[in-house]
Amino acid sequence: DIKDGSLCIEGKNCYTLYYNMMLFFANGGSTCYIVSVGSYEDALNKNAMLTGLEKLTLEQEITLVVIPEAVNLNSNEELRDIQQQMLSHCGDRMKNRFALLDIYPKADENTNIEDQVTIFCTNIGSNFLSYGAAYFPWLNTSVVGDRDLTGDVFVWTDNIYANRNKLSDID
């Protein structure tokens, strides 16, 4: 049930970094480095994410490596490749940082937690595991308050850039 004056977002939002950052700072996070790997006009891309990971070698102060939108890539294999590279980056190349990893979302409602964990453990491999951790199950929460809701309906598409005019029209 949608109340008057609320914003209803339907569909999957692949671009979650803004909300991830809101939660990071709301829970005591401070200094944070963000590497841009594209725009809303671009689809999420494994190679762009890996290029962004490579750029982190230029900054020595980084202690925690997180790529939260990697779980929104097209396949479990793409997520696996990124996470293996994150562990290698932290444990082999830099040796001074830690990777926070996510477990790929359920394929469907019949997928059980044990299967998700088994797939993750099989895919992640055995290299540099002391340089990373996976937190599971996911914590689903909202970072949008009632005062942020306007009554408009917005439907996510594969490319949010196509909806940029709808977003700019919302007061």
Regions found by a protein language model. Name each.
Residues 1-171:
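Surface-exposed assembly/interface segments
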